[in-house]
Amino acid sequence: MTTTLQQRESASLWEQFCQWITSTNNRLYVGWFGVIMIPTLLTATTCFIIAFIAAPPVDIDGIREPVAGSLLYGNNIISGAVVPSSNAIGLHFYPIWEAASLDEWLYNGGPYQLVIFHFLLGVFCYLGRQWELSFRLGMRPWICVAYSAPVSAATAVFLIYPIGQGSFSDGMPLGISGTFNFMFVFQAEHNILMHPFHMLGVAGVFGGSLFSAMHGSLVTSSLVRETTEIESQNYGYKFGQEEETYNIVAAHGYFGRLIFQYASFNNSRSLHFFLGAWPVIGIWFTAMGVSTMAFNLNGFNFNQSILDSQGRVIGTWVDVLNRAGIGMEVMHERNAHNFPLDLASGEQAPVALTAPAING
């Protein structure tokens, strides 16, 4: 008997690299999307940290009134932010090499564009990496579909809204108080609280929280006892076990009697699909709402107050929203020559600007 030994051809360096990139045996899966994701997210994170700590004031409104956002210029963790790029730049792409100097680039808010462009590209690739890893492992692709909800929301506030408003200075600042300022101004200019898509988003987020708490508490309350009373119930589960760790029949019976029979799921798969779909669809609607309001397709506006037969104002919740919106909009426009046009023009309409007198 003759045995022939053939030496295996060594794989090229490129093939070895491809195998390492796509290997699911690595501690952290890289993937082809990860090749772009890793450097872009590292760049965005590094620039954000440096700008949050030490960036000089930015002329956000383009009127030579710089706004300081970094820690070294008097802010704290709550008030600090990476200030959006200047209104003088508008929607122009503003990399470092487009500025005459580094000082000019910093003054016009160049770090903001650098952070958001690299961040958005990074999270897009993170979404693609989720699909890629699911594909390699033979899983279904719903993880990346769920992740598309926060990705679409981030894209709406950082990219779509500035495009619709005509300037990256209208983008959301990268900070805690900057986020709240963005929300106030958004309400003042677009009446987002009266937009149906925002209402669906609120239902998605709060409803998702409620359903998550209900599901977790039901499962925890119907665990199959595998331990003694002096041991933690967590020891009753072994990773990879085939047996159910909780009694879905008991949970179904409890919840069906607590509310009514058909309010409870009797199928674990449909239950978990519902838990995933509800908040995702809600946040999708919010992202669509912000994207449409970016082009000034705003929420419902009830600008005229309700009047009685003698012309006196009947105060409603709408009047409260209108008064708050007008106040926030005026405070937002810091320079007189850029007074909000919807406040400076138009026919006079009776609006409840004073609190009703209470006689008692």
From Swiss-Prot:
The chain crosses the membrane at residues 29-46, 118-133, 142-156, 197-218, 274-288. One of its GO terms (molecular function) is iron ion binding. GO terms for biological process: photosynthetic electron transport in photosystem II; response to herbicide. GO terms for cellular component: photosystem II; plasma membrane-derived thylakoid membrane. It comes from the Bacteria. The D1/D2 heterodimer binds P680, chlorophylls that are the primary electron donor of PSII, and subsequent electron acceptors. It shares a non-heme iron and each subunit binds pheophytin, quinone, additional chlorophylls, carotenoids and lipids. D1 provides most of the ligands for the Mn4-Ca-O5 cluster of the oxygen-evolving complex (OEC). There is also a Cl(-1) ion associated with D1 and D2, which is required for oxygen evolution. The PSII complex binds additional chlorophylls, carotenoids and specific lipids. [CaMn4O5] cluster binds at D170, E189, H332, E333, D342, A344. Fe cation binds at H215, H272. The record marks A344, S345 as: Cleavage. A quinone binds at H215, S264, F265. Photosystem II (PSII) is a light-driven water:plastoquinone oxidoreductase that uses light energy to abstract electrons from H(2)O, generating O(2) and a proton gradient subsequently used for ATP formation. It consists of a core antenna complex that captures photons, and an electron transfer chain that converts photonic excitation into a charge separation. The D1/D2 (PsbA/PsbD) reaction center heterodimer binds P680, the primary electron donor of PSII as well as several subsequent electron acceptors. PSII is composed of 1 copy each of membrane proteins PsbA, PsbB, PsbC, PsbD, PsbE, PsbF, PsbH, PsbI, PsbJ, PsbK, PsbL, PsbM, PsbT, PsbX, PsbY, PsbZ, Psb30/Ycf12, peripheral proteins PsbO, CyanoQ (PsbQ), PsbU, PsbV and a large number of cofactors. It forms dimeric complexes. Belongs to the reaction center PufL/M/PsbA/D family. Cyanobacteria usually contain more than 2 copies of the psbA gene. This is Photosystem II protein D1. It comes from Microcystis aeruginosa.
